[in-house]
Each structure stands twice: as structure tokens, then as C-alpha cells.
Amino acid sequence: MTKKVAVGLSGGVDSALSAYLLQKQGYDVVGLTMATWDGSVNMPAVEGREGCYGPSEDKNIEDAKLVADRLGIPHYVVPVAGEYKTKVLDYFRAEYRAGRTPNPCVRCNQSIKFGALHLAARKMGIEFDYFATGHYARLDFKNENEPFLYRALDTGKDQTYFLSRLSAEQLSTVLFPLGGMHKDDVKALAAEIGWNDFAEKRESQDFIECGDYSVLFEESDQVPGDFVDVSGKVLGKHKGIVNYTVGQRKGLNIGGQKEPLYVVAIDAAKNQVILGPRSALSCIQVSAVDLNLMVSENSPLLAGPLDAHIRLGHKGSPAKILDLEPGRIRVEFETPQFAAAPGQVLVLYAGDGVVASAIIDK
């Protein structure tokens, strides 16, 4: 019996080609597009920008439907705006209000794209054996001592960081058709089959379309407070802690200093933003919570060598695990790292495989 695959169609080239390739492989393919925009945020449409959440969602839905029409497959728009607000937007706001720096795309994958979307689709009567997306990542389930999520062949486009909070159960029925391809080859294939409109489409640049996170917050969040140095000396006034993140240098507007100042920490309880020199952001260890262990706790891979990433785009650092207990991990880097921000995701790799992820605490 032919297996049915639901492909998450975003309206972009990667998900479009994933659906095309799976159909060529003989799967019974249906398209799902999640609808997250409900107009509750006062966000301007910005021409030339693409984002996952914003007023141009209708255009992306139209593009997803165009893919489905070209392939002759059913297409369903699945409303998940309520879940998106609760699990992603409210979480994002709460983290910034607490002085932390969340990654909303990681959260969306964990809670919505590989969670609420599936449940909502099945409630609509849409049944499927597998779920596929256009993510650049690979899966290989061997045994509990080995990773099951691996970096993509195209390391420049690898998206395992975004997927690192997913469980084995969530990924057990997932397909990533592009994991063994390079992005240039995906675009070339799109052009080859006459889908130049998708090959040339601009990629999503941020989780919100306009790129300005301030639109997600209320006026009551913009509470001025003190900029202080590491000794507690007041240096000036900030515009509200939700406007700052650890490691930030631009937009501080503090003059008369011997060297550039950075955001070193944020004290939400005191409504203070602590500033200091770049050297004050150097750290050799991090502790992280909400541990997602992607191998058995007895796996020899945890003994190292490990490659630690403390944010998206971080080049990584050799590291070792100092402490590992239920829900918590402490890691030491081989060399000091810059600006490990609380709230960001720590991802540990053994070779190309993801062995663990957690939320940086301190």
C-alpha cells in the first residue's frame, strides 16, 4: 500500500521541491500549510522581506497552493494561530521580559510545525503516515547510543540547530528529502522543471516579516531603567529591557567610555541592563536547563569529543560535559566563548550527529 506523506508547504522552493521529490519517489503526497497570522499584531507589510509570521501570509499560502496545483495533490490550510500565539509569541515575550534571549524558530519547530500542526490536521480528518519538510538535515535511526539527527550534506545550509529540541518520537515519522542535497542543486532542479518562480523567490529572513521585534511588545513593556556598569555605577538610561540582549553593542548610546561597552547581563527584577567591556562576556562554562538528550545517557559519545554551539551562526567550539543530570547539563569549552546568552539554545554535536540540546541558563 502506498504510504501517504504530508509535506509542510511554506510557499518556498525548499518545501516545493521536497513535495516534488517525494511524489517522484512514489509517495501519495498532500500539502499542509499552517496559518499563524491573525492580524492581532500591528505589523506593517515590508516589500521585499519574507518572514514566517506577518501580513503577507496570504501570498505564501497562494504560492503553496500553486505548488500543489502543479503536482496535482490536495492542499490544506491548517489554522494554528491560537497555538502559535501561546507557544511562540507569548513565550518570546515572556523570555525577553525576563531578560533572556529566546530563539522563536526553534520553539516553533518544537511546538507548532512538528506538534500542533499535526494535531490540527488530523482533527480536520487529514491522515498521513509521514510528515516532511524542506529542512536541510538528515535522519538515521540506528540504536539508542547513536544520534538520529545529523547535519545536512550542505553544511552551509544545515538546519539541525533549529531542529535540536525535537524528540525521537517527533522525528520518527519525519522525512527530510533535501538533507542529502546542496541548495544550489535544489534551485537548479527547480529551474530544470520550469519552476523558476520558486527558484528565484527570496528566502525567509526572520521569524517576523517586518524584522522589528518591538511590534510584538506593549507600550507597558517599554519601561525605562538604568544602564549600570559591572560595579553597579549608573551610566545612563535604557528604553526598556525588552530592547536589549546579552552581547549587544549597538544602540546603547553611552558615550565618554575608554572602550566600547556591551550588554553583559540583564537584571529584570531591578529593571537594569548591565554593561561592560567585551572581555566581560568571555565565558569558559555554561549551565543549561530543559535538557533534550538525543542519545542514551550511557552513550560513549557523550564522553567526547563534542562540538558546542551556543547560538545560531556560532562557529562552534570543542567542549566537554562536566555535569549531566536529569533536565540539566554543564559544559566547559576548550577556549573561552563570547556572549553565551541566557535563553539561547546550546546544541552539542558528536561529529555530524546531534547528541543533546538545552536552554542556556547561566
Predicted features along the sequence, with ranges:
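ATP-dependent adenylation/nucleotidyltransferase module used to activate substrates
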Residues: 1-164, 191
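AMP-forming adenylation/ATP pyrophosphatase catalytic core
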Residues: 132-139, 143-144, 148-362
